[in-house]
Regions:
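HIT superfamily nucleotide-processing domains
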Residues: 1-240
C-alpha cells in the first residue's frame, strides 16, 4: 500500500504538484526494488478510489502488486505490441498517439510530455488513458521534467473528473509498462488507464450487466463527446 498523504481528506486532485511528484518517485523506487527480485516479472501499480470501486479504506492510497507471471490482460497487450513492432519496426502506441493528436477530438489534456485522451475503444463513459509522448517503456526512465509533467497531468485530469459532477470522482486506475524480466521491451510504451463508473451524476453509475456481460460492451456516449465534456471542465478544483 502507498499512502498518498498523511491527511485523510487529501486526494490527488487536491494535492500540490510537489507532493504528487513524491508519489511518482515512490512508484519508481518500488518498480525498481520489486523488479530487481529475480522471480518478479510484473509490477502492477494501481489505485481504487471510492467505496463504489471496492475501496474499504477511505484514506487516499494506491497499491502495488508484484508477481512472477504476466497477468492475462498484460500478456495479451504485450503480444499485440510485439506483433506490431515486429511487422513495422515501430511502436504501436506511439503511432496511435500520433493519429489521435492529428484527429484531436478525443484529446482531453496535452502538455509537453504527456497526453490524456479518451481511447476510441473505451467502454466506460469517462474512461481515459495517459500516454507518454517520448518513447518511454517504464516509469524509471522519466526525466525530472517528465516527472513534473506527469504530476501536472495527473492533477489536471483528476480535477476535471471531480469537477464533472462536483464530487470526489471514483475510479480504478493503473499503470501499464514494461515487464521486469530483464528484456529491453522496445515494443512497450508507458501508459496509464482510468476506469471511472459514473454516468450521469454523482449517484448514477454505469452497470456492466445483461448483454454487456454476456455479449459485448455498449457505449452510453461517444468517446468524442466524453472527451469534449471532460476538456471543458476547469483545471481549478470546484472546492476552491
Amino acid at each position: 500500500m502507498v499512502c498518498f498523504s498523511p491527511r485523510h481528506d487529501l486526494t490527488l486532485p487536491e494535492m500540490e504538484i510537489k507532493d504528487i511528484e513524491n508519489i511518482i518517485h515512490t512508484w519508481q523506487k518500488e518498480y525498481t526494488d520489486l523488479g530487481n527480485i529475480d522471480y518478479i516479472n510484473h509490477v502492477q501499480i494501481f489505485e481504487n478510489k471510492g467505496s463504489v470501486m471496492g475501496c474499504s479504506n477511505p484514506h487516499p492510497h494506491g497499491q502495488i502488486w508484484a508477481q512472477s507471471s504476466l497477468p492475462t490482460q498484460v500478456e495479451k497487450t504485450q503480444n499485440n505490441l510485439k506483433s506490431y513492432y515486429s511487422k513495422n519496426n515501430r511502436n504501436l502506441l506511439q503511432d496511435y498517439l500520433k493519429a489521435e493528436l492529428i484527429k484531436e477530438d478525443r484529446i482531453v489534456i496535452e502538455n509537453e510530455h504527456f497526453v490524456a485522451l479518451v481511447p476510441f475503444w473505451a467502454i466506460w463513459p469517462y474512461e481515459t488513458m495517459i500516454i507518454s509522448k517520448r518513447h518511454i517503456n517504464k516509469i524509471t526512465d522519466f526525466t525530472a521534467d517528465e516527472v513534473t509533467s506527469y504530476a501536472v497531468i495527473l492533477k489536471q485530469l483528476t480535477t476535471k473528473y471531480d469537477n464533472l459532477f462536483k464530487t470526489s470522482f471514483p475510479y480504478s486506475s493503473g499503470i501499464h509498462q514494461a515487464p521486469t524480466d530483464g528484456e529491453p521491451h522496445e515494443e512497450w510504451q508507458f501508459h496509464m488507464h482510468f476506469y471511472p463508473p459514473l454516468l450521469r451524476s454523482a449517484t448514477v453509475k454505469k452497470f456492466m450487466v445483461g448483454y454487456e456481460m454476456l455479449g459485448e460492451s455498449q457505449r452510453d456516449i461517444t468517446p468524442e463527446k466524453s472527451a469534449g465534456i471532460l476538456r471543458e471542465q476547469s483545471d481549478i478544483h470546484y472546492k476552491k
